Amino acid sequence: MLSWGAANAQNSSAQVGVAAAVVGEVKLSNAQSPKPKTVAVRERIALADLIQTGKGGRLQLLLLDRSTFTIGANSVIRIDRFVYDPSRGRTSGATVVRGAFRFMSGQSNRGNSAAVSSPVATIGIRGTILEGVVGEGARDIAKHEDKAVREADADKKTATLVVLRGPGAGTEPGAEVGAASVTSGGVTVELTEPMQAAFVPRAGAAPIGPFRISPGGLSSLHDQVFPEKSGGGGLGKALLGGALIILPAVINGGGKKPARGSTPGPNDPAGVPGKP
Protein backbone atom coordinates (compact mmCIF):
# COMPACT_ATOMS: atom_id res chain seq x y z
CA MET A 1 0.00 0.00 0.00
CA LEU A 2 1.17 3.53 -0.72
CA SER A 3 1.10 6.22 1.94
CA TRP A 4 0.92 10.00 2.16
CA GLY A 5 3.52 12.41 3.49
CA ALA A 6 2.97 15.58 5.52
CA ALA A 7 3.33 17.65 2.35
CA ASN A 8 -0.21 16.71 1.36
CA ALA A 9 -1.79 17.90 4.61
CA GLN A 10 -3.21 21.05 3.07
CA ASN A 11 -5.18 19.06 0.49
CA SER A 12 -7.97 17.63 2.62
CA SER A 13 -11.69 17.70 3.36
CA ALA A 14 -12.73 19.24 0.00
CA GLN A 15 -15.30 16.75 -1.31
CA VAL A 16 -15.02 15.86 -4.99
CA GLY A 17 -17.55 13.04 -5.21
CA VAL A 18 -18.78 9.76 -3.76
CA ALA A 19 -18.15 6.06 -4.18
CA ALA A 20 -21.15 5.10 -6.33
CA ALA A 21 -20.32 1.40 -6.60
CA VAL A 22 -17.76 -0.75 -4.80
CA VAL A 23 -16.77 -4.38 -5.36
CA GLY A 24 -14.16 -6.32 -3.41
CA GLU A 25 -11.21 -4.67 -1.71
CA VAL A 26 -11.08 -0.89 -2.16
CA LYS A 27 -8.94 1.16 0.25
CA LEU A 28 -8.56 4.90 0.84
CA SER A 29 -5.83 6.87 2.60
CA ASN A 30 -4.79 10.52 2.92
CA ALA A 31 -2.55 12.81 4.96
CA GLN A 32 -4.93 12.85 7.93
CA SER A 33 -5.56 9.09 7.81
CA PRO A 34 -2.40 7.47 6.40
CA LYS A 35 -3.56 3.98 7.37
CA PRO A 36 -5.71 2.68 4.47
CA LYS A 37 -9.37 2.14 5.33
CA THR A 38 -12.06 0.23 3.47
CA VAL A 39 -14.26 2.30 1.14
CA ALA A 40 -18.03 1.83 1.39
CA VAL A 41 -20.76 2.69 -1.12
CA ARG A 42 -21.85 6.35 -0.79
CA GLU A 43 -18.63 7.26 1.02
CA ARG A 44 -17.48 10.79 0.29
CA ILE A 45 -14.21 11.12 -1.60
CA ALA A 46 -12.07 14.20 -0.95
CA LEU A 47 -9.32 16.02 -2.80
CA ALA A 48 -5.95 14.24 -2.56
CA ASP A 49 -7.43 10.96 -1.34
CA LEU A 50 -5.40 7.98 -2.54
CA ILE A 51 -7.61 5.10 -3.69
CA GLN A 52 -6.33 1.56 -4.19
CA THR A 53 -8.15 -1.53 -5.38
CA GLY A 54 -7.12 -5.09 -4.58
CA LYS A 55 -6.96 -8.13 -6.82
CA GLY A 56 -10.74 -8.40 -7.06
CA GLY A 57 -11.53 -4.78 -6.23
CA ARG A 58 -13.29 -2.26 -8.44
CA LEU A 59 -14.68 1.21 -7.85
CA GLN A 60 -16.92 3.71 -9.61
CA LEU A 61 -16.39 7.27 -8.40
CA LEU A 62 -19.15 9.77 -9.15
CA LEU A 63 -17.83 13.34 -9.23
CA LEU A 64 -19.85 16.39 -8.22
CA ASP A 65 -20.51 17.34 -11.85
CA ARG A 66 -21.78 13.79 -12.55
CA SER A 67 -18.70 12.75 -14.41
CA THR A 68 -17.64 9.22 -13.50
CA PHE A 69 -14.24 7.72 -12.88
CA THR A 70 -14.15 3.93 -12.87
CA ILE A 71 -11.06 1.93 -11.89
CA GLY A 72 -10.41 -1.78 -12.25
CA ALA A 73 -8.57 -4.27 -10.05
CA ASN A 74 -5.03 -3.70 -8.75
CA SER A 75 -5.25 0.02 -9.51
CA VAL A 76 -4.08 3.15 -7.70
CA ILE A 77 -5.47 6.64 -8.35
CA ARG A 78 -5.48 10.05 -6.70
CA ILE A 79 -7.80 13.01 -7.35
CA ASP A 80 -5.43 15.97 -7.64
CA ARG A 81 -7.73 18.80 -8.66
CA PHE A 82 -11.42 19.55 -8.88
CA VAL A 83 -13.06 22.92 -9.57
CA TYR A 84 -16.78 22.97 -10.28
CA ASP A 85 -18.89 26.00 -11.15
CA PRO A 86 -22.23 25.00 -12.76
CA SER A 87 -22.36 28.29 -14.68
CA ARG A 88 -18.84 28.05 -16.06
CA GLY A 89 -18.14 24.35 -16.32
CA ARG A 90 -15.59 22.35 -14.43
CA THR A 91 -12.00 21.24 -14.46
CA SER A 92 -10.71 18.12 -12.80
CA GLY A 93 -7.51 16.15 -12.63
CA ALA A 94 -6.39 12.76 -11.39
CA THR A 95 -3.24 10.68 -11.32
CA VAL A 96 -3.38 7.00 -12.25
CA VAL A 97 -0.32 5.36 -10.73
CA ARG A 98 -1.21 1.95 -12.11
CA GLY A 99 -4.13 -0.05 -13.43
CA ALA A 100 -7.08 0.36 -15.79
CA PHE A 101 -9.59 3.20 -15.76
CA ARG A 102 -12.49 4.83 -17.57
CA PHE A 103 -13.43 8.52 -17.43
CA MET A 104 -16.89 9.55 -18.62
CA SER A 105 -17.67 13.27 -18.88
CA GLY A 106 -20.79 14.61 -17.16
CA GLN A 107 -24.14 15.42 -18.75
CA SER A 108 -22.90 18.64 -20.31
CA ASN A 109 -19.78 18.85 -22.44
CA ARG A 110 -19.72 22.64 -22.56
CA GLY A 111 -16.92 24.34 -20.66
CA ASN A 112 -15.73 21.07 -19.15
CA SER A 113 -12.21 19.73 -19.20
CA ALA A 114 -10.35 17.05 -17.35
CA ALA A 115 -6.81 15.75 -17.16
CA VAL A 116 -5.50 12.36 -16.17
CA SER A 117 -1.81 11.88 -15.50
CA SER A 118 0.18 8.67 -15.50
CA PRO A 119 3.83 8.31 -14.51
CA VAL A 120 4.80 9.01 -18.14
CA ALA A 121 2.00 11.02 -19.79
CA THR A 122 -0.60 13.74 -19.38
CA ILE A 123 -4.02 13.06 -20.92
CA GLY A 124 -6.42 15.90 -21.66
CA ILE A 125 -10.11 15.00 -21.93
CA ARG A 126 -12.77 17.23 -23.49
CA GLY A 127 -16.38 16.08 -23.31
CA THR A 128 -16.06 12.37 -24.00
CA ILE A 129 -15.44 8.85 -22.71
CA LEU A 130 -11.88 7.67 -22.41
CA GLU A 131 -10.41 4.34 -21.32
CA GLY A 132 -6.81 3.64 -20.43
CA VAL A 133 -4.41 1.41 -18.59
CA VAL A 134 -1.07 2.07 -16.91
CA GLY A 135 1.60 -0.56 -16.35
CA GLU A 136 1.89 -4.19 -17.37
CA GLY A 137 -1.63 -4.31 -18.79
CA ALA A 138 -0.75 -1.57 -21.27
CA ARG A 139 2.44 -3.31 -22.31
CA ASP A 140 0.63 -6.62 -22.83
CA ILE A 141 -1.99 -5.04 -25.11
CA ALA A 142 0.70 -3.18 -27.06
CA LYS A 143 2.42 -6.46 -27.98
CA HIS A 144 -0.48 -7.27 -30.30
CA GLU A 145 -1.01 -3.87 -31.94
CA ASP A 146 0.60 -2.08 -34.92
CA LYS A 147 4.30 -2.74 -35.56
CA ALA A 148 5.46 0.60 -34.15
CA VAL A 149 3.49 -0.08 -30.98
CA ARG A 150 4.40 -3.71 -30.40
CA GLU A 151 8.11 -3.12 -31.09
CA ALA A 152 8.42 -0.18 -28.70
CA ASP A 153 10.68 -0.64 -25.68
CA ALA A 154 7.90 -0.50 -23.09
CA ASP A 155 8.36 -0.27 -19.34
CA LYS A 156 6.09 -2.75 -17.57
CA LYS A 157 5.46 -0.38 -14.64
CA THR A 158 4.74 2.90 -16.42
CA ALA A 159 3.71 2.18 -20.03
CA THR A 160 0.42 3.95 -20.76
CA LEU A 161 -2.28 3.12 -23.31
CA VAL A 162 -5.22 5.46 -23.96
CA VAL A 163 -8.31 4.85 -26.14
CA LEU A 164 -10.98 7.40 -27.09
CA ARG A 165 -14.42 5.79 -26.80
CA GLY A 166 -16.83 8.66 -27.53
CA PRO A 167 -20.09 9.68 -25.80
CA GLY A 168 -22.44 7.18 -24.20
CA ALA A 169 -26.12 6.87 -25.05
CA GLY A 170 -27.03 8.70 -21.84
CA THR A 171 -25.01 11.80 -22.68
CA GLU A 172 -26.82 15.12 -23.07
CA PRO A 173 -28.66 15.35 -26.43
CA GLY A 174 -26.46 16.96 -29.06
CA ALA A 175 -23.23 16.00 -27.32
CA GLU A 176 -20.31 15.51 -29.66
CA VAL A 177 -17.69 12.79 -29.68
CA GLY A 178 -15.27 15.09 -27.90
CA ALA A 179 -11.52 14.64 -28.04
CA ALA A 180 -8.49 13.70 -26.01
CA SER A 181 -4.83 14.61 -26.14
CA VAL A 182 -1.86 12.58 -24.95
CA THR A 183 1.37 14.43 -24.14
CA SER A 184 4.79 12.97 -23.35
CA GLY A 185 8.37 13.80 -24.24
CA GLY A 186 7.32 17.25 -25.43
CA VAL A 187 5.01 15.78 -28.09
CA THR A 188 1.20 15.82 -28.13
CA VAL A 189 -1.01 13.38 -30.03
CA GLU A 190 -4.69 14.23 -30.60
CA LEU A 191 -7.41 11.58 -30.51
CA THR A 192 -10.51 12.81 -32.33
CA GLU A 193 -12.33 9.67 -33.48
CA PRO A 194 -13.75 6.77 -31.44
CA MET A 195 -11.35 3.82 -31.11
CA GLN A 196 -8.29 5.95 -31.83
CA ALA A 197 -5.49 5.14 -29.40
CA ALA A 198 -2.10 6.38 -28.28
CA PHE A 199 0.67 4.48 -26.51
CA VAL A 200 3.48 5.91 -24.38
CA PRO A 201 6.00 3.13 -23.78
CA ARG A 202 8.18 4.77 -21.12
CA ALA A 203 9.21 8.05 -19.51
CA GLY A 204 10.49 10.63 -21.97
CA ALA A 205 9.19 8.81 -25.04
CA ALA A 206 6.84 10.54 -27.46
CA PRO A 207 3.34 9.04 -27.78
CA ILE A 208 2.89 6.52 -30.59
CA GLY A 209 -0.29 7.21 -32.51
CA PRO A 210 -2.96 7.89 -33.21
CA PHE A 211 -3.69 4.33 -34.31
CA ARG A 212 -6.90 2.35 -34.34
CA ILE A 213 -6.87 -0.18 -31.54
CA SER A 214 -7.49 -3.78 -32.59
CA PRO A 215 -10.68 -5.59 -31.54
CA GLY A 216 -8.57 -7.88 -29.35
CA GLY A 217 -6.81 -4.95 -27.72
CA LEU A 218 -10.09 -3.17 -27.06
CA SER A 219 -11.59 -6.31 -25.56
CA SER A 220 -8.57 -6.80 -23.31
CA LEU A 221 -8.74 -3.20 -22.10
CA HIS A 222 -12.47 -3.44 -21.48
CA ASP A 223 -11.95 -6.63 -19.46
CA GLN A 224 -9.40 -4.86 -17.27
CA VAL A 225 -11.80 -2.01 -16.52
CA PHE A 226 -14.93 -4.17 -16.23
CA PRO A 227 -14.01 -7.78 -15.42
CA GLU A 228 -16.91 -10.16 -16.05
CA LYS A 229 -16.29 -11.98 -12.81
CA SER A 230 -17.29 -9.48 -10.15
CA GLY A 231 -17.02 -11.22 -6.77
CA GLY A 232 -19.45 -8.88 -4.97
CA GLY A 233 -21.82 -8.38 -7.89
CA GLY A 234 -22.72 -4.72 -7.42
CA LEU A 235 -20.31 -2.99 -9.78
CA GLY A 236 -20.28 -5.79 -12.32
CA LYS A 237 -24.07 -5.72 -12.62
CA ALA A 238 -24.29 -1.94 -12.68
CA LEU A 239 -21.59 -1.41 -15.28
CA LEU A 240 -21.66 -4.53 -17.43
CA GLY A 241 -25.42 -4.24 -17.59
CA GLY A 242 -25.06 -0.72 -18.98
CA ALA A 243 -26.56 1.16 -16.04
CA LEU A 244 -24.92 3.97 -14.12
CA ILE A 245 -26.76 4.80 -10.92
CA ILE A 246 -26.45 8.44 -9.91
CA LEU A 247 -26.79 9.27 -6.21
CA PRO A 248 -28.23 12.82 -6.20
CA ALA A 249 -29.05 12.88 -2.51
CA VAL A 250 -25.40 12.26 -1.69
CA ILE A 251 -23.98 14.53 -4.38
CA ASN A 252 -26.10 17.64 -3.91
CA GLY A 253 -28.53 16.96 -1.10
CA GLY A 254 -31.51 16.92 -3.45
CA GLY A 255 -34.26 14.41 -3.97
CA LYS A 256 -34.22 14.25 -7.74
CA LYS A 257 -34.90 11.04 -9.56
CA PRO A 258 -31.65 9.12 -10.19
CA ALA A 259 -30.24 9.62 -13.64
CA ARG A 260 -28.86 6.81 -15.74
CA GLY A 261 -26.03 6.73 -18.21
CA SER A 262 -24.74 4.07 -20.57
CA THR A 263 -21.62 1.96 -20.63
CA PRO A 264 -20.35 1.05 -24.12
CA GLY A 265 -19.27 -2.54 -24.58
CA PRO A 266 -15.97 -3.63 -26.11
CA ASN A 267 -17.50 -4.25 -29.54
CA ASP A 268 -19.30 -0.92 -29.92
CA PRO A 269 -17.24 0.76 -32.68
CA ALA A 270 -18.56 4.24 -31.97
CA GLY A 271 -18.61 3.85 -28.22
CA VAL A 272 -22.42 3.78 -28.20
CA PRO A 273 -24.15 0.43 -27.66
CA GLY A 274 -26.02 -0.81 -30.69
CA LYS A 275 -24.85 1.93 -33.02
CA PRO A 276 -22.45 1.40 -35.94
What are these regions (language model features)?
Residues 4-6:
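N-terminal signal peptide c-region/cleavage motif recognized by signal peptidases
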Residues 232-237, 245-262:
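Short hydrophobic alpha-helical membrane-entry/anchor segments
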Residues 8-229, 244, 248-251:
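Flexible, surface-exposed loop/linker segments and immediately adjacent secondary-structure boundaries
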Residues 256-276:
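Short, low-complexity, Pro/Ser/Thr/Gly-rich segments in the mature regions of secreted, periplasmic
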